[in-house]
C-alpha cells in the first residue's frame, strides 16, 4: 500500500534529500565553535568577577562602569546561549533535520544582530565584527535554503505573488495588504522605500524646524550619514511606525497617537543612548526642557534623550503618517517601473549599506582621534586623510564628541 503523500508525519522526497557536503562542514564548524565558546565565556566571566572583587574594574571599564558591566553581562549571557544553540543547530544539520535547523537559524540571526550591537558599544568598529557579520550572512542564506520544503513554498508564493501584484496594479491596490488587516503590505520592497524616502523627508523637516524654532534664520546641516541628504533615525523610525501602526490605521486616532508617542519616544531614547554609548556622540539633548515651569520629567528620566513635547510630536507624526502620508507614499513607490523596481531596490540597498558602514567607521575613527587611541593602520589613515576632525564637525554639525561618555572597554 502506498504511503499517503499528504501525511505530514511521512517525510517527502525533498525532506530526505541529503545535506550538501559544504553545509555539513559548516555544521561541524558550528559545533566546534559552540563547544569552544562555552569555556571561553566561563573564563571571561571569571575575569570580570575577579576584576570586580579586586576593585580594579574601574580602570578597565572607564567612567561608565555600571553601563559597561551591564553590557558585558548581557554579552556573556548572549554568547553562552548562542553557543548552546549553535551546537544544537550543527547537530540538526548533520542529522538532516532541516525544518528544525531553519527555525534555529532565525533565533541565531536575532542573537547575532544583538551581539553585533553590543560589540560596537563595547569596542567600536573593528575586525572583530567580521566573524559575527559573516555568520549573519551565512545564517540568512541558510534560513532560506536549508529547508527545501520552505524554499519550494517561497518559490510558489513568489510566483503567485507576481500574479497577484499585477492584478492589484490593474486595480490600483498594489502594495496594499490583501487581508485587509493592515494598510500596507510589510515586504522588503515597501519597507526599504519607506526608509529611503523618510530619511530624506525627515532631514528636510528637521532642517526647517531648526531654522524656524531652534535657531530662527540659521541653517545647520542635520544630516546623519556620511554621504547624501539622509537622516537614518527618521528612516528607521518610519519603518517602525509603519510596522507597528499598520493594523491600527482604522483605529481610534487617540490610540494611534498614544502608540506612536510611546514607540517614537522609546526609539529616540535607544538611538541616543546607543550613539553616546558606542561613540561618545550626542546629537540632541532635551535636558533644558520645561513642563509647566518645572523640569520635564521624561527628559530627566531619559537623560535628556527625549521629552514630553517631542513624545507628543512623535504621536502626532505617527497619526499623520498612517492616515495621510503613508497612502500617498505608497502611490509614489508604485510609480517605480515594474520591470526595474527590484533591480532599483537592490542597487539603492547596496548604496545605503555602503554609506551606513562608512558612516559608522568614520564616527569610530573620529572617536579614536579625539580619544588619542587611533591605530596606525591603512583604514585609519584613509579616514584620517579624507574625513578628518574638521570634516566630521562640518558634516555632522549637530553632533558633539565626548569620548568619556562612551563605554569602550
Which role does the model predict for each range below?
Residues 2-409:
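Aromatic-rich, lipid-facing transmembrane alpha helices and their immediate juxtamembrane interface loops
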Amino acid at each position: 500500500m502506498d504511503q499517503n503523500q499528504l501525511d505530514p508525519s511521512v517525510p517527502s522526497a525533498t525532506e530526505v534529500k541529503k545535506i550538501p557536503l559544504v553545509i555539513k562542514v559548516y555544521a561541524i564548524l558550528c559545533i566546534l565553535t559552540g563547544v569552544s565558546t562555552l569555556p571561553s565565556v566561563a573564563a571571561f566571566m571569571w575575569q570580570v568577577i575577579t576584576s570586580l572583587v579586586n576593585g580594579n574594574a574601574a580602570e578597565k571599564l572607564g567612567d561608565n562602569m555600571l553601563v559597561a558591566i551591564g553590557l558585558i553581562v548581557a554579552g556573556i549571557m548572549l554568547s553562552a546561549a548562542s553557543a548552546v544553540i549553535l551546537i544544537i543547530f550543527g547537530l540538526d544539520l548533520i542529522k538532516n533535520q532541516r525544518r528544525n535547523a531553519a527555525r534555529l537559524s532565525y533565533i541565531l540571526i536575532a542573537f547575532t544582530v544583538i551581539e553585533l550591537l553590543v560589540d560596537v558599544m563595547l569596542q567600536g568598529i573593528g575586525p572583530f565584527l567580521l566573524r559575527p557579520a559573516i555568520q549573519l550572512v551565512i545564517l540568512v542564506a541558510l534560513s532560506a535554503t536549508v529547508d527545501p520544503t520552505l524554499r519550494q513554498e517561497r518559490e510558489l508564493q513568489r510566483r503567485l505573488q507576481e500574479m497577484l501584484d499585477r492584478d492589484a496594479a490593474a486595480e490600483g491596490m498594489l502594495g496594499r495588504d490583501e487581508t485587509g488587516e493592515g494598510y500596507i503590505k510589510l515586504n522588503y520592497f515597501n519597507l526599504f522605500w519607506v526608509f529611503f524616502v523618510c530619511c530624506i523627508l525627515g532631514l528636510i523637516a528637521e532642517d526647517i524646524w531648526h531654522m524656524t524654532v531652534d535657531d530662527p534664520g540659521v541653517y545647520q546641516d542635520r544630516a546623519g550619514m556620511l554621504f547624501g541628504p539622509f537622516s537614518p533615525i527618521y528612516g528607521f523610525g518610519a519603518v517602525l511606525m509603519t510596522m507597528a501602526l499598520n493594523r491600527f490605521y482604522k483605529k481610534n486616532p487617540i490610540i494611534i497617537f498614544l502608540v506612536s508617542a510611546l514607540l517614537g519616544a522609546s526609539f529616540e531614547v535607544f538611538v541616543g543612548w546607543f550613539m553616546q554609548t558606542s561613540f561618545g556622540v550626542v546629537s540632541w539633548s532635551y535636558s533644558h526642557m520645561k513642563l509647566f515651569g518645572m523640569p520635564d520629567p521624561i527628559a530627566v528620566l531619559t537623560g535628556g534623550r527625549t521629552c514630553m513635547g517631542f513624545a507628543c510630536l512623535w504621536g502626532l507624526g505617527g497619526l499623520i503618517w498612517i492616515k495621510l502620508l503613508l497612502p500617498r507614499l505608497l502611490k509614489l513607490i508604485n510609480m517605480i517601473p515594474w520591470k526595474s523596481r527590484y533591480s532599483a531596490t537592490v542597487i539603492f540597498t547596496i548604496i545605503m549599506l555602503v554609506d551606513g558602514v562608512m558612516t559608522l567607521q568614520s564616527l569610530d575613527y573620529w572617536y579614536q582621534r579625539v580619544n588619542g587611541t587611533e591605530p596606525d593602520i591603512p583604514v585609519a589613515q584613509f579616514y584620517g586623510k579624507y574625513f578628518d576632525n574638521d570634516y566630521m564637525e562640518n558634516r555632522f554639525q549637530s553632533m558633539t564628541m565626548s569620548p568619556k561618555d562612551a563605554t569602550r572597554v
